[in-house]
Design a protein with these regions (language model features):
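Hydrophobic beta-strand signal
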Residues: 56-57, 71
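Aromatic- and Lys/Arg-enriched surface recognition patch
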Residues: 66-125, 129
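Hydrophobic/aromatic beta-strand segments within beta-rich folds
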Residues: 14, 51-55, 122-124
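A generic structural signal for short beta-strands and their flanking turns/coil linkers
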Residues: 10, 30, 51-53, 66-68, ...
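Charged phosphate-binding loop/patch that engages nucleotide di/tri-phosphates or the phosphate backbone
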Residues: 127-144
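Short, acidic Gly/Pro/Ser/Thr-rich loop/turn segments
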Residues: 19-21, 97, 132-134
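Short, charged beta-turn/beta-strand-edge "cap" motif at the junction between a beta-strand
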Residues: 58-64
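Compositionally biased, charged N-terminal/linker segments
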Residues: 1-51, 139-144
Length: 144
């Protein structure tokens, strides 16, 4: 399922272990190369990313949660270290405070078919339009 176009943008979710790379680091650095993805399905998602698409940054450890939003600033492309892999550049947009926890997402009852719930090991995935709309209602302070 490709990222859902909503107002011309597509939306994705990318997971990270905050001990490896956190939203705080992305905010400080302003931009990063998103790499380290190995799963074939997640690599396909990275390759589909285009400049202007939005990516929800999800901390996968501790209390799992969507913690921020980034914008894709370069298209998905082969990883220069390993052409079988793919990378994309992300630019920090905003933090989501309070973070949207996995418990909160599950409790909404709206996203049982989303890969975030069904395929918990998948590191990068499209975000459904319903999630984007729900998040805009739940956290209106973060504009994306």
């Amino acid at each position: 399922m490709p990222g859902i176009p909503l107002g011309g943008k597509r939306y994705f979710l990318a997971k990270t272990d905050p001990e490896t790379y956190s939203i705080e680091q992305l905010e400080r650095e302003k931009q990063t190369v998103w790499d380290g993805v190995r799963n074939p399905q997640a690599l396909k998602t990275i390759r589909e990313m285009k400049p202007g698409d939005c990516v929800f940054i999800y901390h996968s450890m501790g209390d799992p949660a969507v913690v921020g939003v980034a914008e894709v600033s370069s298209p998905g492309r082969p990883d220069p270290k390993d052409a079988k892999l793919a990378v994309a550049d992300f630019r920090f947009l905003c933090r989501i405070n309070p973070p949207v926890t996995l418990k909160e997402i599950k409790a909404s009852g709206n996203f049982d078919d989303w890969a975030l719930i069904r395929q918990s090991r998948l590191s990068t995935m499209p975000a459904p339009e319903a999630f984007v709309e729900w998040l805009r209602r739940e956290r209106p302070h973060c504009r994306f």
